[in-house]
Amino acid sequence: MIRLIRYEFIKQFCKRSILALFVVFSLANLFKIYGEYKSYSYLTDGKGVRSWHTLHWQLYEEFQGEITSEKVERLLAVYQPLVEATSDMTASTATDDPNTMTGNLYSDRNLLDKYFVQPMQYFYEYSGQSEQVANRARQSAALYGERGAVYQQRESGAIYNLYAGRTIPAFAYREMCNYYLNYDFSIVLTLLLCLYGTIGTFVSERETQMDMLLLVSPNGGRKTTLAKILAATLFLLLTSLWFSFLDLIGFAASFQTFEGLALPVFAIPNFAEASVNLSIFQYVLLSAALKCAGAWTIGMLWLLVSMFWKNALLPFVMGLSLCMALIASGAACAYSNFFWTKALNPYSLLTNRVLLGKTEFINLGGFPVLTWQAAIWFALIAGLVLVAAIYFLSAENCRRCVRREK
């Protein structure tokens, strides 16, 4: 069986066209990531003595690590005079002031404000804010318990368990991680490549009428169908994993650092309400797994659509249309209160920021289940149903073809 899976994988997914697309899409993704860095980072002004890039990393050596009152005082001792000097907007705009770090007072203030003061303030204040959320949830749980509202009590208890004790004890550079976690372009490339690769899995056999011959071969029929499904699964998982980790490598190479991966994911502002208590690196691994689950479920849907056609063009168009419908519905519900819609749409697992970045629950049998956890179960169940349909319908479809030929 392993040899048959290997044969199907090489035959279907090691074609020159697929390998060429793999290379082209990977390069396009890396160029896009580098473009994000050049467009949005303020540390791209070269490596001169007075550049933001050089000064930032010099200051970072001083302030990184555990947030202490001593570090805060040192930072404010530099920052506060700059605020006072520039608050009325009458300070000199000269760019060669020898008494400044960057050559300009306003530039000095902006550098410290963006990369040190604001992040450190957010880190310092976050524990207090999360503790307030936890306390309110605990009070709500007690109140709902008195009223006999069991589900609401359980939901409030789950929120308390998530937010109690959240802290960001250390200061670290977070810009690279911020852009990485909010990057979606590779998802489009993953879907296009997976669609192009999987859509011909059954079509090629029907085009040459090999599907009828397989019925009487030793490894034909359902055994070959199972091998095709497993080979397609392997292709979908490898493609999804490749782009997930290519994103991380691309951002780390562009920003020239892996700094920030040890921070908790809620150190990124738009993940302040994250439904997981993980480090950013752990989040990367979870995100990759969720993307694999989403890509696999959508891929099985494409396989089911394609198995009834002799020409690849029509199922490709149909698969692309299905994909666009999932994307459109996912985008429409991404930041809405339609939690069930997000959980049922496998595309949400690909753009899992909308699931993991918010603490949202759905009611399953009176128990609050986080939307990302529910989405995994729904995707796996849907995928297994699709696999079963492909497995049993494939042989039946071939028998009908044989009867028509007779």
What are these regions (language model features)?
Residues F22-F25, K228, G319:
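Residue-level recognition of transmembrane alpha-helices
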Residues L215-G221:
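Short helix-to-coil transition segments within interhelical loops
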Residues L27-A77, G128-E205, L226-F308, A328-G330, ...:
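Secretory targeting signals
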Residues G35, W309-N345:
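Transmembrane helix segments
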Residues M1-L19:
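Aromatic- and glycine-rich beta-strand/loop motifs that create alpha-glucan
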Residues S39-Q118, Y124:
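N-terminal, intrinsically disordered, polar/charged segments of Gram-positive cell-envelope systems
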Residues C14, I18-L21, G294-W302, L355-K406:
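Alpha-helical transmembrane segments of multi-pass membrane transporters/translocases
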